[in-house]
């Protein structure tokens, strides 16, 4: 999958789950299961419920995503 194929959307973290997984509610109302990208994990960036984040979604599975940015 090329980098151009991903869909970037913004959302809010609703719930934290084990193994660095999060339930994120997108701006359009959908809820997706998202994991943390490697750079966020490397730099020990904390993500808590209520945080606004950017999520990358694959066009093949719109129910799962990757958190790529946490807004300050």
Swiss-Prot record:
Keywords: Cytoplasm, Initiation factor, Phosphoprotein, Protein biosynthesis, RNA-binding, rRNA-binding. Residues 1-72 form the S1-like domain. It is found in: Cytoplasm. InterPro entries: NA-bd_OB-fold, RNA-binding_domain_S1_IF1, S1_domain, TIF_IF1. One of its GO terms (cellular component) is cytosol. PROSITE patterns: S1_IF1_TYPE. The keyword rRNA-binding applies. The modification Phosphotyrosine is found at residue 60. GO terms for molecular function: ribosome binding; rRNA binding; translation initiation factor activity. Component of the 30S ribosomal translation pre-initiation complex which assembles on the 30S ribosome in the order IF-2 and IF-3, IF-1 and N-formylmethionyl-tRNA(fMet); mRNA recruitment can occur at any time during PIC assembly. One of the essential components for the initiation of protein synthesis. Stabilizes the binding of IF-2 and IF-3 on the 30S subunit to which N-formylmethionyl-tRNA(fMet) subsequently binds. Helps modulate mRNA selection, yielding the 30S pre-initiation complex (PIC). Upon addition of the 50S ribosomal subunit IF-1, IF-2 and IF-3 are released leaving the mature 70S translation initiation complex. Belongs to the IF-1 family. This is Translation initiation factor IF-1. It comes from Bacillus licheniformis (strain ATCC 14580 / DSM 13 / JCM 2505 / CCUG 7422 / NBRC 12200 / NCIMB 9375 / NCTC 10341 / NRRL NRS-1264 / Gibson 46).
């Amino acid at each position: 999958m090329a980098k151009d194929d991903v869909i970037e959307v913004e959302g809010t973290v609703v719930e934290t789950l084990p193994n660095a997984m999060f339930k994120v509610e997108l701006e359009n109302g959908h809820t997706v299961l998202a994991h943390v990208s490697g750079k966020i994990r490397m730099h020990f960036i904390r993500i808590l419920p209520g945080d606004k984040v950017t999520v990358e979604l694959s066009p093949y599975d719109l129910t799962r995503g990757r958190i790529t940015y946490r807004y300050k």
